[in-house]
Regions:
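Flexible, solvent-exposed loop/hinge segments and secondary-structure transition points
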Residues: 2-252
Length: 252
């Protein structure tokens, strides 16, 4: 984890790469390198996960694959991009997931072009020894990846004291990525470290009870859950059973 002497590099309350890996493997099935029963929808492929702090600096990176290229290699960068996006567009009292940005950024919609702003920094995401990818020595740790991602898989992380940062996952369909990120955020509250003290804590968001899914209970003040459709802050249905997956409830 990044050294906390510089406030921008403070990863207090956020998981180490080892804790992140253990939590990730607990929410994906054996086909994806994990131990979970059931499926998250999608392809059940090995996953990447990245956590950033509230300034967008990477604190930890992990994979559920046995080697760096067991999962889609490009998804390592995408997971970092998703974490950076979810953090940058979530406030202490209002969360936006990357899934919430899908429809607003399509052609003709109000946020079209957002995905081309704040590009990924290639000097960060492609640096270093590839054999270190997804380990506690991942070369991205301690740096800002940049990038804006506008499909499922990135969610903010909150404690009772406010926003801690965000996590991003990638390696499957974008809808399955959202499901895994949602479950992973919930798991991190019980993974044996301080900080994310309330499972799936989200103080508010664009999803309300009127547009929620029975498989994804909505927090009273709204949350950053995925909504399937083509209007507002909705996301395309990936078509591989992802929308039928039962997800943990959200807490305010």
């Amino acid at each position: 984890m990044a050294a906390p002497n510089n406030p921008a590099n403070d990863c207090t309350g956020l998981p180490s790469s080892a804790v992140l890996e253990a939590a990730l493997k607990a929410v994906v099935p054996s086909a994806a390198g994990g131990s979970a029963t059931g499926t998250n929808g999608g392809l059940d492929f090995p996953m990447w996960a990245t956590v950033v702090n509230r300034y967008g600096v990477i604190c930890s990176v992990a994979t559920s694959g046995s080697t760096a290229d067991d999962a889609w290699l490009n998804s390592r960068v995408i997971s970092a991009q998703k974490a950076y996006t979810a953090n940058g567009f979530s406030r202490p009292t209002f969360a936006l997931s990357t899934a919430n940005l899908f429809t607003p950024t399509q052609n003709g919609n109000s946020l079209n072009g957002l995905q081309f702003s704040n590009p990924v920094d290639p000097r960060v995401v492609y640096r270093g020894n590839p054999t270190k990818y997804g380990t506690p020595d991942d070369p991205m740790i301690g740096l800002k990846p940049g990038g804006i991602n506008v499909f499922g898989g990135g969610v903010a992380l909150y404690s009772t004291g406010g926003k801690l940062g965000a996590l991003g996952v990638s390696g499957d369909t974008s809808c399955a990525d959202h499901n895994i990120a949602w479950k992973l955020r919930n798991r991190l509250a019980t993974a044996g470290f301080s900080g994310v003290t309330v499972a799936n804590r989200v103080p508010g968001g664009v999803r309300s009870a009127q547009v929620g899914s029975s498989n994804q209970p909505v927090a009273p003040s709204g949350d950053d859950g995925i909504m399937y459709g083509s209007t507002g802050f909705q996301h395309a249905d990936c078509g591989n059973g992802e929308k039928n997956v039962v997800l943990p409830a959200v807490n305010n």
